[in-house]
Amino acid sequence: ILAYTKMQEVIGTLMLDIISVKEYCEKVVKEDVNSSVLTGLNESIDNLKLGDDKTKQYKAELKKAFQEYFLPAYSDIIKTMKELDSSKNNTLGLSHMKNGKEYYELLFKQATGTDKSIEDIKKELNSMSRSSLLAVQSVISKNKNLYDEYVNGKIKTKYKDFESMLKDLDKDIKDDFPSVGTLNYRIRPIGEDLASGGVAAYFNIPALDGTTPKQIRVNMLEDALNVQSLETFSTVAHEGIPGHMYQIAYAYKNVKDPWRNSMASFLGYTEGYATYTELYALKYLDGVSADAVKLQQNMVVYQDCLIALADIGIHYEGWTKEDLSNFLEENGLGVSDVSDFYNQLQANPTAFLSYYVGYVQIANLKKDAQEELKDKFNDRDFHEAILKSGAAPFHVVEENVKDYIESAK
């Protein structure tokens, strides 16, 4: 990988956030054998209950490999980042490179799981952003103080811990999602040396034949999660129930082909579905008004659509930082300096599209089903339709929804 990175520098296709990569690797190396990676692996050895002698032997071998291979690999990354000529690092989007737009089109299809053109997706994003903004304005017009409470983070949930959120969600979704039986899981913090302020939580995809508890890792850094915030509740729903953990459990139970469960990877579907559920789950909150829930849902969708449009703008239409600043200003999200936001999107083309374009596909399928079926529409049956095939391209999901509509008429 490092040789490839150096080759990119030579031929002019290097596109990295060099400083962030270097700083993260330095943090990992600094922890040395106290790394949470090694700690976690040692815990896995303990859980095997191999006896004192074998446990001691394997831990010693693991520590040796960690010191001889793992840490030096991170040191090599740091060394390479220092050697790179920052003047040869591209600071604009892919469209400024030879064949860059064509490459972005391929990345776009891979990330979104849809065969729709970029122009068609832009229309969908613009349409949804407008409808979300209108919904926000409708809420604010009725309750002007609510928006102030929202932007100042004063709208809180009752929760003090993640476990209580998942326990309640597991109970609350029973009428709206098909059963997957009892979910055995645990929630563990991400080690501080590996944690990043940009990652609030993640779900570890379990082995097909695994029997250990499913695992959600949460970021305990102060700038990552506030336990009582609406965003944290949504994050837990996204990673846990009815999001990734639930969706994987459903697929493992109902999609009998192990190859599909292990090899099929359609991030547009999996992240789009989880984004849909994080917003849907807000309806279950006690002590948070319906208007506050509606405001949160539509503000998130509005901002997500703008992020997706900005990604397209930077990498497909050649936006500069000034272009991005003007776009955000025109849409009510002006900031004094867009550099960090621009650099994040520029260094990671299509990284957010799986979430946001994927969500739009599911939301539009639901809207179509609701308009077609009217009072015959049922959330549980719709959810079963979009879960039916496991991770799949959206043309398959669309066919499942069409079948649901026909059967429900």
Question: Locations of the language-model features?
Answer:
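N-terminal maturation segment of proteins
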Residues: I1-K409
